[in-house]
Amino acid sequence: MAQVAPTGAPTDAPPAYPPPPQQAPPPQQPGYGQPQLGYGQPPPQLGYGQPPPQLGYGYPPPPQNNNMMMNNTVVVTAPAPAPANNVVIINQKKDNCCRQAIPAHHIAAAILCLIFNIFFPGIGTIIAGFAVFCCGNPGADGGSKVGTMCINFWIGLLQIGTVWFFFLGWIWSIMWGAAFIGMSADYHSGGDTTIVATGGGGTTVINN
């Protein structure tokens, strides 16, 4: 039978199982100052005395931001053409009551009719009435010229018939000849000018 050691007796016997031998770290490779991970060394933490890792040493490059490149695209368009301005000039003559009775002749014809009325009362008035068809009242229609001729023909006859009555016809014919010279300004004038300007801002009408 095996003997049982008494309680409290010192046990100086070696342990039944020896401890496992510890493995030594592998030797460091040249060019790497830090030991490799996975051999009993904790991984280094950034921000605690360790420099940040450099690009190109086992770290992928950062992704490029394609949205920034798309947002920087500049589109240049041609400016819209300015609206064209159109200017229309209209010259027209407006009839008046004096023009219907007193024809508008050239200044030379008006002076000639005045001379006839001075020396031959009423004759210059009749000549001015018939001359309206060839060289008087520019721009007037045919009916207006016929009316002017009839008025001056009958006025010329009245001037001839009243010249013996206190020289009334003679004075009347001189005043009528002076009116021929006054109406000659209407013959030389271009009439009323109307300027119509159209553009992007609307239509502008100017009457001169």
Curated annotation (Swiss-Prot):
**Per the UniProt annotation, where are the glycans attached?**
N71
Q: State the encoding gene.
A: SPEC3
The ranges of region (Disordered) come to 1-63
Has the keyword Disulfide bond been applied to this entry?
no
Cell compartments where the protein resides: Golgi apparatus membrane; Cell projection, Cilium
Q: Where is the composition biased (Pro residues)?
A: 12-29, 41-63
Tell me the protein's name: Protein SPEC3
Q: Where is the composition biased (Low complexity)?
A: 30-40
Question: Which species is listed as the source?
Answer: Strongylocentrotus purpuratus
Which UniProt keyword terms apply here? Cell projection, Cilium, Glycoprotein, Golgi apparatus, Membrane, Transmembrane, Transmembrane helix
> PANTHER family given for it?
PROTEIN STUM
Record keywords: Membrane included?
Answer: yes
The residue ranges crossing the membrane are: 107-127, 163-183
Q: Give the UniProt entry's GO cellular component terms.
A: cilium; Golgi membrane
Predominant localisation class: Golgi
Q: How does it sit in the membrane?
A: Multi-pass membrane protein
